[in-house]
Amino acid sequence: MISQFEIIGDNKIGVLPKQVDQLQMCRDIAASKDLQENDSSFMLVDLDKIIERFQLWKRELPMIEPFYAVKCNTDLVLIRILASLGCGFDCASKDEIDIVMGTGVSAERIIYANPCKTRSFIAHAMDRDVKMMTFDNPEELLKIAKLHPNAEMILRIAVSDPTATCPLNLKFGADPIIAAPQLLKTASEEGINVVGISFHVGSGCNDASAYRNALQHAKNLCEIGEGLGFKMDIIDMGGGFPGAEHHNPFEKIAETIRDALDEFFPDTNKRLIAEPGRFFAAGPFSLVANIIHATEVPASKITKDPKDCADHGYMYYINDGVYGSFNCILFDHAHPIGSPLFDTDRNEKFMSTIWGPTCDSLDLVEDKKLMPKMNVGEWLYYPDMGAYTLAAATTFNGFSKPVPMYVMSEEMWESIRDSTHV
């Protein structure tokens, strides 16, 4: 169990003598809450895993600087840990810039990676000396030139993987063949400083070859930009890196990127950056929700098949839902899979539905799920719940967000404790 408590920012951190076992730690916390008759949901945050993910990144892609996509999860402890490791930050708004700089991160470690920015936010970026920022259209280019003449502009191109969980090229990115060269010419004519090329293959990329195609376009555009007198020092590879077990593992994506860099940018002195979000945020966060109600129904009510009317089914209601942490189901196309937190000897499984706590029938967490019969007061465990969950959670209907509980091992604590960001 926890051997000591430390502080990161304003948050209490439980330090353990050995590596964190997320499932067992969740069981220990839930058992303690049961003794206190406390059924509130909670989010265990394993800070070791953030450091391990950073180490994995540096091992597989040592030539690329990670700039964490703050929109994915604005948890301040997560941000402080990444800052202490030397990570940069991808911000999309005034508030995100202030959140990051509030932890002591310098402006040089921030990219304002939103191609369509509010005018007052651009002025704020200038006030805070944040210079790197993206654009994908002439109107944005001229708007930034007027409001932030010292900005270092990075041209975002549309190269999204069409099979990605969340393709992004419908909203952002200039056509790399037609529009992008013209934007470089416009910037040159207006005397605006363009320093590189940016792309984003889509959140939850399924096709690693999308990175190769994007880097090929980036090489061509760098040559055009250099011909116009720009230095073109930066290649920003965006996000799309998986944060949990995935049919297209990170190591395979990293291999594709390394090969493409060798092909298109051999012996380069360019600054290579990327904007991973879920890669860092997903795995450290485990959600534990309490079953607040259970009711038996004909299985046909769940399967919508009249032939199942004689079978038993169960509908469970838990104290978190799509208006809370599970908003990822609606906004991130996620499919969280929960399981009983504690082992059970109830081997028979029944067709089940997991509902959130609100009065809205849209608040559906899992459907047509086979699981043992559960009772009110028991707990369900959902791993890998840190990406695009808490960042968009609400308190609709008066239901609270889960409380984060932070833990890490003594070894990892010693590795970061002296950082100015902690």
Curated annotation (Swiss-Prot):
Residues that, per the record, bind substrate: 331-332, 360
Subunit structure as annotated in this protein's UniProt entry: Homodimer. Only the dimer is catalytically active, as the active sites are constructed of residues from both monomers.
Annotated binding of pyridoxal 5'-phosphate, by residue: 203, 240, 275-278, 388
Enzyme Commission numbers on file: 4.1.1.17
Reaction equations catalysed: L-ornithine + H(+) = putrescine + CO2
Activity: how regulated: Inhibited by antizyme (AZ) in response to polyamine levels. AZ inhibits the assembly of the functional homodimer by binding to ODC monomers and targeting them for ubiquitin-independent proteolytic destruction by the 26S proteasome.
Residues at the active site: 359
CDD domains per record: PLPDE_III_ODC
Annotated protein name in UniProt: Ornithine decarboxylase
Residues modified to N6-(pyridoxal phosphate)lysine: 71
Encoding gene per record: odc-1
Xref: InterPro entries: Ala_racemase/Decarboxylase_C (IPR009006), De-COase2_C (IPR022643), De-COase2_N (IPR022644), De-COase2_pyr-phos_BS (IPR022653), Orn/DAP/Arg_de-COase (IPR000183), Orn_de-COase (IPR002433), PLP-binding_barrel (IPR029066)
Organism from which the protein derives: Caenorhabditis elegans
